[in-house]
Amino acid sequence: MKWFERQLNFDIWLLGAVLALSFFGMLMIYSTSFILSVQAFGNPYHYFKHELIYLFAGLLGMVAAMHFNNERWRSFASLFMVIAFAGLVAVFFFDATRGAHRWLRHAGFQFQPSELAKFAVILYFAHSLAKRQDKLKSFWSGLAPYLGILGMYVGLVMLEPDFGGALSIGLLGVMLLFTAGVNLKYLAAAGGAAIPVGLYFLASEEYRWRRLVAFLDPWQYSKDYAFQLIQSFLAFGNGGLLGVGLGMGHQKLFYLPDAHTDFIFSVIAEEWGWLGVMAVIAVYALVITRGAMIAIFAENRYSSYLAMGITAMIGLPAVINMAVVTGLLPTKGLVLPFLSYGGSSLLINMFAAAILLNISAKRFQA
């Protein structure tokens, strides 16, 4: 295997895991969406074909990014931030979908700028934190500028509104600040100051705090606010050990809302059983483990921070999504990376994974 890795010059385990998740995701997107596609568009392949286009684009992006020196991305860090910011502002000029302004649309395709914002924040923070390492213990010249940038992007995403996306960006930024070694007292104080803002956002809309109450006692709200979660429980229970078979699940037949997006893991549980669930968890664990090892053995601070951020960008939503569909966390609206329907998420995650693979190549050049 090491000989094979040296020939490819990349971490073959990580590459295999990413490709396995992506292609299995296409299989499950078809399984979970064909009924919805027929009802909405009269074509069972509508969602599948759209995602397939993003998959091909993602594969092309992976090939290009894997052979593009990751150090050169540093010069594009500010540009990515500007483009992401412009996208987050531009969404408010497009029509809302289900009450939210989250997408840019053109010619039948749509793009979610908050997905790009996650990567932009990681790239910019990795570049800047590595360059300004000697100033990070100070509040005003160290932590404050990053908190200001983070607050601006998180605030825009919350206005869409997209609490899950805002939470992801915030956690990724804080994790990188912690990893870089900022003063923990200042970071903790900033976190404490952010709590009232989060509570206000939670209480500002009835459906948000109702979801929280329903999470605490889902069976009491099984007909309304916890309906989706209860249907997820039923999918897990119906799947048993081996599942009911690919395409044979019942919960996706308009019982489980968002079966092809936020709750695709529930359909995997029903159709592939607990063995399938554990296999998916194992592949994500492999991605996280390999990503962490790449970050630890990276050649410099910038590469290490970038690898850690990308690993968290993939691993954190995966863990949160699985916790949500199993009732361990309140509903957040986060998709499962590489598996859920969502071209923006797939495209950005594949591109970011390719950069992670490029960083891993340094280990095999020695």
PLM features per residue range, with description:
Residues A107-A117, L159-P161, G240-V244, L334-I348:
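Glycine/serine-rich anion-binding loops at beta->alpha junctions
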Residues A214, P218-T261, F265, W272-G276:
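TM-adjacent membrane-interface loops and short helices in multi-pass inner/ER membrane proteins
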Residues L15-F23, L27, S31, S37-Q228, ...:
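Hydrophobic alpha-helical transmembrane segments of multi-pass inner membrane proteins, especially
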Residues M1-K2, V319-A366:
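A juxtamembrane structural motif centered on a specific transmembrane helix
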Residues M1-N9, G42:
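Cytosolic juxtamembrane amphipathic/interface segments immediately preceding
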